[in-house]
Amino acid sequence: MSKSRDSYFDNAKFLLIFLVVFGHILRSFINDNHFMLYLYKFIYTFHMPAFILVSGYFAKGFKRAGYVKKLAVKLIIPYLIFQIIYSVFYYIMQDESMANVNPIDPQWSLWFLVSLFFWNLLLYPFSKLSKQWALFVSCGIAVLIGYLDFVSSTLSLSRTFVFLPMFLVGFYLNKHHFDLLRSKRGKQIALGVLAAVFVICWGIDFDYSFLFGSKPYSSFGDVTLVSGLSRIGWYVLAFGATFSFLALVPQKRYFFTKWGTRTFYVYLLHGFIIKTLRQVGLEDWLTDYQSLVILLLLTAALTSVLSSNFVKTVAQPFIELRMTSLLQFVRGTGKNAYLK
């Protein structure tokens, strides 16, 4: 890893991708286990908002020449490749509802690639506003967009606007803000906030899919003023939990820090394994609360394997559209890397 890299953000990205995988594994158990449902809601309150905020933090160079072109190559081409691969995979798994090659209807977690591309493009108009107005307008759009039934998962438009405030906040943050979060006092407050958010997820009955940001308010019942207020309330929880999580991320380099540089691989590839586990009925094998430990270990194993040098070597041509790791292995310079 380059010494110029900030271990803090690599740690944050690894922990967040761990939560992404863990959340997807938990999904199979939430219908029959109340605690896992509450834990699932808690994780979904902040794990993607935090990921999106960190993505916004690293989008400060959006005005550089060729930025959009590089972004399209990095996000849109892999999106189209994996849109086809996932559609074929779902067809093989006999999930006809998911076997869809429609390029404007993202398969499962691929929505993030489309939205990330749009968030970067939206920086051009929003950066012309003051920070306060940009956040106010983005939050206003996000609240109002839920009242429009035609804005949904197509082109990931709903999620793009719902999570846009998180991306903008990350864009406006600087290193000093993160230093404040990581202060001793900041960490103490963070623990209290996360505990409070978990209690709210435990005590308030709400549809967990509201946290996805992918559906209009009409999907959850009668559409009233409360619908928009509910989204505002979620923003309070999401930002509070997101900042609290980031306050607790360690700054030192650990064995998992380097894996934080390969979250894109984990994000794109873990869906194949998750779908397979669901297909074989993992929830029928693990039904007790003790299974939570097994699920955590399974998540750790899956995340570490998909972050490995071997997976990078095999998948790099499809994900990064280059063969650097494979060529290094062929030349003999990367053979020992598989064991690292």
UniProtKB/Swiss-Prot annotation:
Subcellular location: Cell membrane
EC number: 2.3.-.-
Annotated signal sequence range: none
GO molecular function, one term: acyltransferase activity, transferring groups other than amino-acyl groups
Ranges that cross the membrane: 6-26, 35-55, 73-93, 106-126, 133-153, 161-181, 192-212, 229-249, 263-282, 291-311
InterPro entries the UniProt entry points to: Acyl_transf_3_dom, Nod_factor_acetyltransferase
Mode of membrane association: Multi-pass membrane protein
A cellular component term, taken from the record's GO annotations: plasma membrane
One Pfam family matching this protein: Acyl_transf_3
Organism domain of life: Bacteria
Keywords for the protein's UniProt record, in alphabetical order: Acyltransferase, Cell membrane, Membrane, Transferase, Transmembrane, Transmembrane helix
Family, similarity comment: Belongs to the acyltransferase 3 family.
Protein name as catalogued: Putative membrane-bound acyltransferase YkrP
Taxon lineage: Bacteria, Bacillati, Bacillota, Bacilli, Bacillales
